[in-house]
Amino acid sequence: MNTVKPESIALFCLTPGGVALAKRLAAMLPLTCFTSEKLREEGFIPFDGGFANTARQAFTTYTALIFIGATGIAVRVLAPLVNDKFSDPAVVVIDERGQHVISLLSGHAGGANALTRYLAGMLGADPVITTATDVNEMSALDTLAFQLNARMSDLRTAVKTVNQMLVSHQRVGLWWDAELTEEIGQCDIRGFIPVDDLQRLPELDALICVSLRNDLPELPVLHWKLVPQRVVAGIGCRRDTPFPLLATLLARQLEAQKLDPLALKAIGSVTLKKGEPGLMQLASCCRVPFKTFTAEVLREFEHHFPGSGFVRKTVGVGSVSGPAAWLLSQGQLLGETLREQGVTITLGVSH
C-alpha cells in the first residue's frame, strides 16, 4: 500500500483547461496553486517573475510538484535543478483533460509514484509509471523506506543493488523485528520473500532487516538493515551545555536500550530551550526536528516523573525530559531516564 503525503504540494497550470482541472484537484487535496496573472482566479497565486522562475523556487521548497500541461515543459524548466532521487521532490505531470497522470521524477524515494496513483484514482485517469519494479508489479527498497520513514547507513548502494535484484527475480528476503510487525500491512512488500526467523533463513540472495535495534546477529547472507524513525528523546539541560556532551550522553542512552541511532525521530524540550545552541546543533547533527513544549503543557504530565525544585524555579516545571518524551511518544517510554552532568534524557517510541 502506497502512502501519499500531501501536506506540501505545489501545482502549476498555464491554460484555462489547466485552471479548471486544478480547481477540481484543489477541492479534494490540499494544494498551493500557481498560474499566470491573466488566468488567476480566487485561490490561485500568480507567478513570481514568470512560470519558470516560480517553478524553480518551488522545486526547493515543496515536497511535490504537479504540472498540468505538456511533459516537455516540465522537463525543460526543471532540468537544471535535477540532482538526486533521494533529495529531489516528487514531480507529476497531468494533461489538462485529466486523462493521464505521469510520474516524472522521484517515483520511489520522493513518492511520485504513490502520488500519481492517488491523483489518477481521484480523476479516473490512467496512471503512467515506468519504474522497472512497478511495471513488474514489485515493490522497491526505496518505496519501502519511504513508506516506513526509514533510514539506512548505505541506502544509495542498497537501493541500486536490491532493486536490480528484484527485477532480475533474485530472492531478496524481508525480516521484521517483532515490535514492528504491525506495520507490515501499511507497506508494499511485493517481490520480497517473507522471513520469520533469522536463525532459520531460506535460500536467499540478499536480506533486508527492518529493525530499530543495533544488536542483529551475524548473518550468512548479503544483508542491510532498514531503520524506521520511531525513537524520540526528551532532553533537559543547563544553559550552554556543550554539544559534544549532549551527543555523547544521547549516544550512550540509545546504546543502553540497544537502539540504532538512525531510529531517532525527534528531540524535545521545554520552550525556554528553543534557542539552546547545544540542543539545536544536536538535532541538526541527527537530522531530526527539535520540538519544544511550554512549561504549562509539560506540567500536565510531570506527575509521572521525579521533579526538581531547582528545575521548577528555572524553567517553570519540575521535570523536562520525561514529560517531553511522554508528549512525543504518547506515553510510550523506553527504559530509565539518564541523569548526568546536569543533563536528563528520556527515550520513547512513537509509531
Model regions and ranges:
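N-terminal basic/disordered segments at the start of proteins
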Residues: M1-K38, L334-V343, L347-S350
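N-terminal beta-loop-helix "entrance" segment that forms/cooperates
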Residues: C33-Q57, E276-P277, F301-G307
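Short, structured active-site "lid" loops
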Residues: D48-G72, A283-F290
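C-terminal edge-of-domain segments
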Residues: L204-E218, H223-L226, A324-H351
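C-terminal non-catalytic interaction/assembly regions of soluble proteins
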Residues: L262-P323, S329-L333, R339-V343
